[in-house]
Amino acid sequence: MHLTFKETKEEVYAAQRVSKHVSPHLHNALEIVCVTEGTLEMGVGQELYHMEKGDIGFVFSDIIHHYQVFSEKTSRADYILVPSSFAGVFKDKIQGYAPKYPVIRAGQIEPDVYNAIQAIIQMEENEPMIVQAYVQIVLARCIGKMELVEKSCVGSDDLIYRTVSYVSGNFRKKFSLE
């Protein structure tokens, strides 16, 4: 497994783009993905979750994930990455837990969730406070639709996975080998 840690330089990343294969990676941002055309496979840990038009996937901070596209047709999605601090009252959940099943099907999603996502995607200027408000609308509507489990329950027992997860979650802390 080739894994990368992506340092998110921008406070907010929001774009609609053609979906493609993205190798396993992790970052300390909350990632929201909404399929707008075609299909997308979102891999979290060792599980692969199929997503269709209108489905929304959530990757909480410091969770190894990847994307795959198997369809021959063009697939597009809205991708939003924000610091977990943007989650407001949901911040502790974003940092300490992960969705057991990270995809919410289109039929379960209220229209204001799509409106909030589109508002973020269509912003001409980066307005963090406005983005934060929209992210909290999305979370308020969606987080109750997901069963949350401790992050240690998501992923793999594989030594490499566990090592990378530990290092990524603790690399800023001081430590000693004494």
Please give the residue ranges for each predicted region.
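Generic protein-terminus/edge-of-domain signal
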Residues: 1-56, 71
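A hydrophobic/aromatic-rich effector-binding and dimerization subdomain
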Residues: 1-16, 57, 61-126, 136-148
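Amphipathic alpha-helical recognition patches that constitute DNA-binding helices
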Residues: 31, 108, 130, 162, ...
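Regular secondary-structure segments
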Residues: 36, 114-125, 164, 168-171
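Glycine-centered loop/turn positions within well-structured domains
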Residues: 40, 65, 173
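Residue-level recognition of alpha-helical structural elements
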Residues: 109, 123-131, 152, 156, ...
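A short, Lys/Arg-enriched amphipathic alpha-helix from helix-turn-helix/homeodomain DNA-binding modules
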Residues: 151-177
